[in-house]
Amino acid sequence: MIKIDSKIPEGPVAEKWTNYKAHQKLVNPANKRRLDIIVVGTGLAGASAAASLGEMGFRVFNFCIQDSPRRAHSIAAQGGINAAKNYQNDGDSVYRLFYDTVKGGDYRAREANVYRLAEVSNAIIDQCVAQGVPFAREYGGTLDNRSFGGAQVSRTFYAKGQTGQQLLLGAYSALSRQVNVGTVKLYTRYEMQDVVIVDGRARGIIAKNLVTGELERFAAHAVVIATGGYGNAYFLSTNAMGCNCTAAISCYRKGAVFANPAYVQIHPTCIPVHGDQQSKLTLMSESLRNDGRIWVPKKKEDAVKLQKGEIKGSDIPEEDRDYYLERRYPAFGNLVPRDVASRAAKERCDAGFGVNNTGLAVFLDFSEAINRLGIDVVLQRYGNLFDMYEEITDVNPGELAKEISGVKYYNPMMIYPAIHYTMGGIWVDYELQTTIKGLFAIGECNFSDHGANRLGASALMQGLADGYFVLPYTIQNYLADQITVPRFSTDLPEFAEAEKAVQAKIDKFMSIQGKESVDSIHKKLGHVMWEYVGMGRTAEGLKKGIAELKEIRKEFETNLFIPGSKEGMNVELDKAIRLYDFITMGELVAYDALNRNESCGGHFREEYQTEEGEAKRDDENFFYVACWEYQGDDEKAPILIKEPLVYEAIKVQTRNYKS
């Protein structure tokens, strides 16, 4: 069994990061030029890390699955990025951000990592402003803020509804500068297939050229994985179609333990599924919950009429509307954390109060905000989001629909929860290093900062914190002992064996020649994952899900059809490789969910809930990080290793968003 060591520094939580930086090992400028680092991924975490490491003088090889880093899924983030600047003078602080993040994660995050995240958050904003990121500003010129779920202060910095795009352009500009000066070599249209281990350390990768189809070897003194989450294991999610977990799973198979895979975030404000031919879902920013109010009809007969298309939401007067989040959680209202809002929407729809033809939707209404602020102000805040919603649904949320008794009602949006983010990921210690020496994981692909539920606007914060301000310190602590190690040759037998194994897998997939397409099997996988490993989980359902996942694996191995050949570009082959890893990932999520006999954050076991239907934790038996060690892709279940959680600065208690 693999032994894990979180390497959390001694001392008070507020001093750990400062003390770490004061005593860590450093690499001098001359030696940095002799050290090579591979960074896999060019989203916010990967681009910021590659740019920072290049700026420091290391030689960096950066791998991008797309034609350009500007196409990373980070670009889709809409609402904002958190930081504890307290510009609004509303009581925010580093400690408050730290506390809200731990509480939002249902007390299942590593305390020391979360405090460090809150501590460096302010530097992220300064860095991005210096890069020219056009954050929204007040009339007087100071940076503006808005609120997000799980907080009672305004700490979210934003660039209209395109924050991820603007932050990515900032990171991309920094990366481009390093590419231009020669410290970073960028490889576009390459996808990592395996990590190469030499004498127990990560020393390189095998990557597939997605244009030529060829496998290539790359060597370095350290490898950094920044490839995002595994939400597409569910087939339908808000993730970009190319998002996958192949790099992470390849590390898992080589000995990097995987932490808390059951912690999957389901976002409450997504455009509902419109048919069985859909391949992706669209997120509507959490920022909309600042001014939008979520409701369903009070009367079931009104819900039935809505489902039949006999009436519209604007036909229902104020007194017949149930603003259920405001009713249940008066202290936070519509800005409760995502897991709470998602379960509440599911409960209302399961009770028969859904508002579309499938019964799986609730309303997000801006009538009150438009009447209070005026349409111009609302459009200034959310105009591009309104446009996006109208383009997809042909409904304009800013259009007056009806006036009842002098009250103006506008077209409400329809929303429903969907898979969005994964809090689980590759296990890392305080230094962001995995259980494989020299292999680091940053951003969404590690588990470190969000516990069982991520707060809105904290994904961008973590990605940039890891890339700009954490990894550049911690990786030196490892590389300081590698300065006498010469550059590696890719002719080493370990590289040849890794490439041979990847090629054998590709040959095996191409030789199946069955009848089912990749997308067909992926849809079946997604159905099983959503049905049994989705918002509501039970022991019986999870056991059934695991059994069905094994059948899906067998179908993949015996009945998959991949057109074309392995030479040259073959998109279906690339998708098949990713799907095989999604199946492994799905089993891992299900095993973890079955083991965790409690409800916490995004993991909700229906057997473990309070009388009010809230998540019921079991701190006595499950106050730990669940780390899973790979045992094979056959019938063997992974081995559980526990990292006990230690809280020194925060009292662990039941989450309360009602008062």
Q: PLM features: what roles do these ranges have?
A:
Residues A222-Q277, L281, H450-Y473:
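Glycine-rich loop(s) and the adjacent beta-strand/alpha-helix scaffold that form part
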Residues G41-L44:
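Glycine-rich Rossmann-fold phosphate-binding loop(s) that bind the pyrophosphate
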Residues I124-E214, A226, C270-M284, R289:
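Conserved redox-cofactor binding core of oxidoreductases
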Residues E15, N19, Q24-V27, N31-D36, ...:
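Glycine- and aromatic-enriched mobile tails/lids
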Residues D67-Y99, Q265-T269, D276-K280:
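Conserved N-terminal glycine-rich FAD pyrophosphate-binding loop of Rossmann-like flavoproteins
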Residues F58-C64, A259-N260:
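Short beta-strand "acidic-cap" motif of Rossmann-like dinucleotide-binding folds
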Residues S250, A256-E399, Y473-Q476:
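An anion/pyrophosphate-binding glycine-rich loop and adjacent beta-alpha core
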Residues R33-L35, G213-A222, T435:
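Core beta-strand elements of the Rossmann-like FAD/NAD(P) dinucleotide-binding domain
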